[in-house]
Amino acid sequence: NKVKYWMTFNEINNQMNFINDIYGWTNSGAHFGDYDSPEEAMYICGHHTLVASAKAVKIGKEINPDFKIGNMISMVPIYPFSCRPADQVLAQQQMHDRFFFCDVQCRGHYPAYALKMFERNGFNIDITEEDKKVLAEGTVDYIGFSYYMSNTVDSNSIRDISMTTDGSSKHSVKNPFIHETAWGWAIDPEGLRYTLNMFYERYEKPLFIVEN
């Protein structure tokens, strides 16, 4: 009872880069490449992880109602490279990948954009009525997150990300207004302010910077 603040899964959303094997292993203990659809496999594993997180929150509250139990999200905010509408929409869509796990953990249900994406891609994610109940009853009290860099996307650019660990996407490009570290990570303190505002506007929950 001396420890009052808890988190369930560390950087649970890193596995959205299902192409890089390290994230399947570290987030869900799975090798998504073994499946016909690595992306579908990631969402299936992610669903069970979300249910487990919600159950942990509920059990923690039963142990001690004073516990504050949060999630832990790796947040790399996405900027559009230009004012081209295609870049704006791409950045918005890629932010869905950043928010997906947090949306479920904070709101207690799957967002409409995710359910529509499952339908369009023919993904079979077995979300039972019991799962829905568990998710609704096990929302987190606060948002824990890491912030190291921002990312910029260009709808006209495509690259290989199978070995990347910097939170980038296949559409990532260098931001001409931001300096980088020696290993290519954007040095963007304004991005942290942007992230804090974005999180609070979306969820209105307390925020905890866990890694920076």
Residues of each region from the PLM?
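Active-site region of glycoside hydrolase catalytic domains
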Residues: 1-212
